[in-house]
Design a protein with these regions (language model features):
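SAM-dependent transferase fold signal centered on methyltransferase-like domains
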Residues: 1-220
């Protein structure tokens, strides 16, 4: 018999399959679009978000280094992968949209809009593209069903923060995919009414608004 120490191996079959999470009302996160290669898009988006999140909210505990033998490291890696599959507390989770080239990443980060903005600012300042398959990444403050009443209710929940303020300019940017039942003009008019309810002196500015209301509709 060989006196050499046996190596430990593990395969993907040892890991639980990732639970599929589906898009629901009341979520917040990031809406991502890809060039068709969704897995690569997800990888880039998660890496980008994790990297920026660690800069804004560094975890000193994760910087501690401990020497462990190979078997211990492998056991730890398997356990971490299992926890990643089932943990609901992790900051970023991929959500199924059932729409090709569209990905939603749910987040528990408190100010995820600030996180996204910091990514945009860094890319602009460094003049360096950080993704190949991730085409767009938009912070989403709230999700709802694709019905006009649900859209109005969701907007009403978040508009006080953005429009109970001094007069400003704004624009509604509307996009839809796999849905023809929601009328663009109806959505824009309804949201403009809600904005004016906060301050009658807010005005629409399509070319260079100070605030933008992003509406992304996918499916029905």
């Amino acid at each position: 018999m060989s006196s050499k120490k046996r190596k430990s191996y593990f395969s993907n079959s040892q890991l639980p399959k990732r639970k599929k999470l589906f898009l629901q009302s009341g979520m917040k996160g990031f809406f991502c679009t890809s060039n068709g290669k969704e897995k690569d898009c997800i990888r880039e988006a998660l890496n980008l978000l994790d990297e920026q999140y660690s800069k804004i909210c560094p975890k000193t505990e994760e910087n501690e280094f401990r020497k462990e033998d190979i078997e211990r490291e492998l056991e730890k890696e398997v356990e971490e992968l299992k926890n990643r599959c089932f943990s609901d507390n992790k900051p970023f989770q991929v959500i199924e949209t059932d729409v090709k080239s569209c990905v939603f990443i749910k987040t528990t980060v408190n100010d995820h809009v600030k996180l996204a903005t910091s990514i945009f600012t860094e890319i602009k300042d460094q003049k360096k593209c950080k993704s190949k398959f991730l085409i767009r990444l938009l912070p989403i403050e709230i999700t709802c069903k694709a019905y006009i009443d649900d859209i109005k209710k969701a907007a009403d929940e978040i508009f006080d923060v953005h429009f109970k303020c001094e007069p400003t300019t704004y624009a509604v940017m509307y996009n839809h995919r796999c849905n023809n039942s929601v009328l663009r003009a109806e959505v824009i008019e309804a949201l403009c009414v809600l904005v004016r309810d906060r301050n009658l002196n807010h005005s629409v500015e399509l070319k260079n608004p100070k605030k933008a209301i992003l509406v992304e509709i996918i499916k029905g």
